[in-house]
Every structure is written in C-alpha cells, then in structure tokens.
C-alpha cells in the first residue's frame, strides 16, 4: 500500500542519483507483528532472506570493511558499498557500517532498559557527526539512511521506534524491517536473561523521505 501511494500519488517527482524519483515526506507506519521478520505476502516480498540473514549476522559481528568484503563476497551490488574511501580526504579506515556502531552501544541500551523500565533514553544512534565528511565528496560509501532507533518498555512490552532520514521503499525497506525487527528480538532476549520477562511490543517507523 505504501509503495502504491508513493508511485501513484507522489508528493514530489524529481531526478536524483538513482534516476526518476517519486517521493512522499514525513511518512510513518507500524509493523503489526515484528516477530516474523518477514514479508509474508509473495506479491510484496522482493528480497532474499538468505541474504538478509547473512547481512544481519555480519552486522551483529561488529566487523569492519575487510570482514564486510568477505561476508558479501560474490554479491557485487553489496560489495560496491563496502570499499575503502576512494579519495585521500578521508582516513583509509573510514566507513559508515552500522554494525560496529550498534555493537558498541548495545550493552548500554540493554542495561538502561533493565535498570529503568520507564526510560526514554535507550536510543541507539546510527548517524554520526563524522559522517558529514562525506557530504562534499563523490564517494561510494553510503551516508547513513538511519538516524536512530529508540527502545522503550511500556505495559511489560519492549517497543522500538526507528527514525530514517531516507528510505528506498521498493526493496531496501524490507531488509531494514528485517534487520531492525531481529535486533529488537535480540534486545528482548538479552533482557529476559537479566530477568525482565517482557513481550514484543510495537515497532513504529518514520521516514523523512520515503521514495522509489
């Protein structure tokens, strides 16, 4: 339904680096059942969940560029985004991989939720101010599409709200839902280990630019 709306009733139509683009802004939705991780309707699903699982496992390993190249060996479309910088303006180890950022913050997020069930501070930041170094450069390294994910417990359920600055809804949205839903379940499992008997709650998602 979201893709039909963007395609048939776009708020804006323009040419971008991905070609002719249909866009709506300030779009939100809620995933009814984040426990499945999957698009169950075969008419909607556009991704290979074997690839999605590989992507998730790599992300949670916290690996860097070399590990990414090994994980996605043979997948040319993925490999082009996990290369070292092409210009001397950036350090050779510069990257915007989500995995190291997520793995570094996970203990703090889990401990905050376990210690304070009413917390509003369990926010995992993805976009980093250092990423702005990419703005004037012509690099294949992707400027992060995700701002952050905020986790909160209400009525004995773990909820998450994901904020995206930019979202390709035709295909990439599906893998992003998979990754965030599995990460949500991972955090839930870790909280159970600490004695917090919670259920999966709401998975809400906001996109500044939803486009295809």
Task: Outline where the language-model segments fall.
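Terminal, non-catalytic protein-protein interaction segments that mediate quaternary/complex assembly
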Residues: 1-212
């Amino acid at each position: 339904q979201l893709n039909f709306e963007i395609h048939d009733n776009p708020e804006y139509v323009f040419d971008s680096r991905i070609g002719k683009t249909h866009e709506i802004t300030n779009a939100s939705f809620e995933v009814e059942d984040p426990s499945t991780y999957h698009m169950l309707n075969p008419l909607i699903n556009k991704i290979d969940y074997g690839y999605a699982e590989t992507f998730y496992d790599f992300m949670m390993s916290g690996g860097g560029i070399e590990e990414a190249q090994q994980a996605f060996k043979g997948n040319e479309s993925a490999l082009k985004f996990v290369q070292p910088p092409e210009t001397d303006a950036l350090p050779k180890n510069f990257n915007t991989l989500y995995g190291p950022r997520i793995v570094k913050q996970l203990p703090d997020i889990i401990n905050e939720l376990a210690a304070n069930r009413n917390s509003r501070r369990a926010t995992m930041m993805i976009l980093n101010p250092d990423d702005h170094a990419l703005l004037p450069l012509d690099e294949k390294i992707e400027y992060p599409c995700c701002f952050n994910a905020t986790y909160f417990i209400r009525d004995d359920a773990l909820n998450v709200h994901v904020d995206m600055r930019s979202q390709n809804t035709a295909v990439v949205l599906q893998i992003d839902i998979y990754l965030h839903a599995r990460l949500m379940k991972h955090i839930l499992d870790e909280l159970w280990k600490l004695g917090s008997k919670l259920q999966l709650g709401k998975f809400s998602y906001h996109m500044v630019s939803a486009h295809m």
